[in-house]
């Protein structure tokens, strides 16, 4: 059972299904318009295993230890309180479960083009050390082999057992 936070139009859920073949995927987004688009794509992409829900990644509407895996395709940096987003991911993830993430850092989204295209909070931002520390503080162990640059991080963190 998997969760994608900030699912947008559903592309991430399609990747999750094709790559990991989970029995079910819950996909959550705060933007109803994006969820409506994801609903249309769900039919076109034959994603019967997908359940769409309106919700906030800073306050996930799920029970503790509900998911085997949580996926984040560049959503945490959109959260005003990104720390609560990480805490919530850890809370809903089962022990031994994986948090699969891709995140970008301020040097990338502070670019004028990014600022024009997408809204990003400007206060309480993170870079690599803060993001990695927050994972550890919430019982999420970053696996070796993660990729990081000045602009982004890509990796998997496993919840401690």
Regions found by a protein language model. Give the residues of each.
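C-terminal lobe and adjacent flexible extensions of AdoMet/dcAdoMet transferase-like proteins
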Residues: 156-161
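Short catalytic micro-motifs in class I SAM-dependent methyltransferases
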Residues: 74-75
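Class I SAM-dependent methyltransferase SAM/SAH-binding core
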Residues: 3, 8-59
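A conserved beta-strand element that flanks and buttresses the S-adenosyl-L-methionine
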Residues: 71
